[in-house]
């Protein structure tokens, strides 16, 4: 795992209060892990598949005006493209009802340890930090333990247009220590570069696309 992501996750876990009563009344913390069964498409050509692990942490609180925070780490390693994607998200609850939750905010995405293989076999990296808009939704199916979930990140920076979209189902299993949820769905990451392969004269734009099913679990307390 990328050292930056590891340090950030450990720090986040260390600073969380340990009082269960405080958690029930003032904050909610969640940790989760997923496996993304991604299929890559580079410059509109289907390439190899890769199992991409995904770890995340969120912290929601009752402080007025201060955003909730989230941290997500994704590692994709394929033959024609690879990256460590670290998302730092700051968001507010726009709608919070018994059967529906909708959040909006911003995400700073750090791409690290990246590699892109151009059609002429030259290799380039796209290590950079980008600004993205963020939205997520959770709709509970009445009288069931199931939620319909979705998340969307979109950014249009100077030389990179990016989107990261997820949709799926979530099953809740309440336990004494908190809430355990199992997830499954589909995720798409789409990156469009305008000036990535500068030394490859025949390449005007570069495309890195990955999509596939994911499964995972989340614990909230």
Name each model-derived stretch.
Residues 21-77:
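Short glycine/proline- and aromatic-enriched beta-strand/turn motifs that initiate or cap beta-hairpins
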Residues 63-148:
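Gram-negative (and chloroplast) outer-membrane scaffold detector with strong preference
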Residues 27-31, 55, 67-71, 100-106, ...:
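Transmembrane beta-strands of outer-membrane beta-barrel proteins
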Residues 27, 49-55, 82-86, 100, ...:
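Residues that define the transmembrane beta-barrel architecture of outer-membrane proteins
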Residues 33-41, 73-77, 108-114, 131, ...:
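Transmembrane beta-strands of outer-membrane beta-barrel pores
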Residues 18, 56-65, 91-97, 137-143, ...:
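Outer-membrane beta-barrel proteins
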Residues 173, 208-221:
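Outer-membrane beta-barrel "beta-signal"
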Residues 1-28, 221:
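Cleavable N-terminal export/targeting peptides
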